[in-house]
Amino acid sequence: KTLTLSGSNTYTGGTLISDGTLVASNVESLGTGDVTNNATLELNTGGDFTNNIGGSGQVVKSGDDALALSGANSYTGGTLISSGTLV
């Protein structure tokens, strides 16, 4: 199961990913709250992703642009760079 969020969101609550893949194609797609990722978070975008990422899931960087993860990240599932640059 895959859900793609492409617009900018302004909610401040957290995001919980418990199964499948959540694809964010905009650095503002997940609002400003913490992300608890226990499945797969795919960031198909460039820019500065400032949300904190925790949980046991994997983070995937896709898309051609450069992406910075500047939040306080504690996720343990590893990072896969399928395309683009992670800085």
What are these regions (language model features)?
Residues 1-56, 66-87:
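Surface-exposed loop/turn positions within long extracellular repeat scaffolds
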